[in-house]
Amino acid sequence: MKIGIPKEIKNNENRVAITPAGVMTLVKAGHEVYVETEGGAGSGFSDSEYEKAGAADRCRTWRDAWTAEMVLKVKEPLAREFRYFRPGLILFTYLHLAAAERVTKAVVEQKVVGIAYETVQLANGSLPLLTPMSEVAGRMSVQVGAQFLEKPHGGKGILLGGVPGVRRGKVTIIGGGTAGTNAAKIGVGLGADVTILDINAERLRELDDLFGDHVTTLMSNSYHIAECVRESDLVVGAVLIPGAKAKLVTEEMVRSMTPGSVLVDIAIDQGGIFETTDRVTTHDDPTYVKHGVVHYAVANMPGAVPRTSTFALTNVTIPYALQIANKGYRAGCLDNPALLKGINTLDGHIVYEAVAAAHNMPYTDVHSLLHG
């Protein structure tokens, strides 16, 4: 199979969908790999490294990468990339379609086979292709939150770890999954007063065992969320419902916070969990202030640490890409239930129910199309 790797064009998106080692894996399996010129530069990979690994040396433009049978990316396509959509194109990337109506309509209209990293799901409910980026974003969330709590960045001037005789900063993390757990690790490491909320009592027990008395765990409900948000210096939104939006923090709750507090919405690429995160920001202009509260809503947080992120991402995506390339998407997905859950669009239909619901568009069962 011909596999294309275009250069990411989203603002400050320095990750790339494949490392030279990944190229070598695919080439050794008999596939052709086309990496756009300087596609890996942001992650520290040169064109010559890709060529030595077996990538075609004649790929120079977006067009060359996008004309492949399968395109591997990191982030959802931007409007100027829609021109390369065509029936049967396999697009394997983070799609986050529930929060991207324009992208959804484009892949449906052009009958693109849209396979989303974030909805590939194992039998135990875990999301193996989302996990590494959730780890990165979770750890970054408290780092950037601490930075924007500084007065020169619009914050209230709080040091999260405090100093002797001065209270520590209060951090609330909504969601105790991978991102939330990693946020807590950094918060605890900085010496902050950390509270984690989750709807799963068993998960709260696990977090209590993991962190002991270094964190407070609370059952997530509207009452506890409102109380914690009001008292916090930094709130991290780390809730993900695969393929869907999850607005948990109301505008009224945000209004109750003291001026200069900070919200970091890790889930903004899926629509976010705060009613007041009404826009997506960029690494160039990462924050805005609403009701006196600093909002950080960068949709590609791991793009700021591309070297780490690219290795972490491709470690988990390449085995699935190899399965698609070896068997084709139909057989590959039918043979692997986890990969089957990754299909969001197929033959002009939305086949992931949460995406269809998010845009009030028709839903079609994927099996009826794959077996048709």
Swiss-Prot record:
It comes from the Bacteria. Catalyzes the reversible reductive amination of pyruvate to L-alanine. A key factor in the assimilation of L-alanine as an energy source via the tricarboxylic acid cycle during sporulation. CDD domains: L-AlaDH (cd05305). Pathway: Amino-acid degradation; L-alanine degradation via dehydrogenase pathway; NH(3) and pyruvate from L-alanine: step 1/1. GO terms for biological process: alanine catabolic process; L-alanine catabolic process; sporulation resulting in formation of a cellular spore. PROSITE patterns: ALADH_PNT_1, ALADH_PNT_2. Its EC number is 1.4.1.1. It catalyses: L-alanine + NAD(+) + H2O = pyruvate + NH4(+) + NADH + H(+). Homohexamer. It comes from Geobacillus stearothermophilus (Bacillus stearothermophilus). Retains about 50% of its initial activity when heated at 85 degrees Celsius for 5 minutes at pH 7.2. InterPro entries: Ala_DH, Ala_DH/PNT_CS2, AlaDH/PNT_CS1, AlaDH/PNT_N, AlaDH/PNT_NAD(H)-bd, NAD(P)-bd_dom_sf. The active site is at H96, D269. Belongs to the AlaDH/PNT family. Keywords: Cytoplasm, NAD, Nucleotide-binding, Oxidoreductase, Sporulation. NAD(+) binds at residues 134, 178-179, 198, 220, 239-240, 266-269, 279, 298-301. It is an enzyme of class 1 (oxidoreductase). This is Alanine dehydrogenase. Gene3D superfamilies: NAD(P)-binding Rossmann-like Domain (3.40.50.720). GO terms for cellular component: cytosol; plasma membrane. It is found in: Cytoplasm.
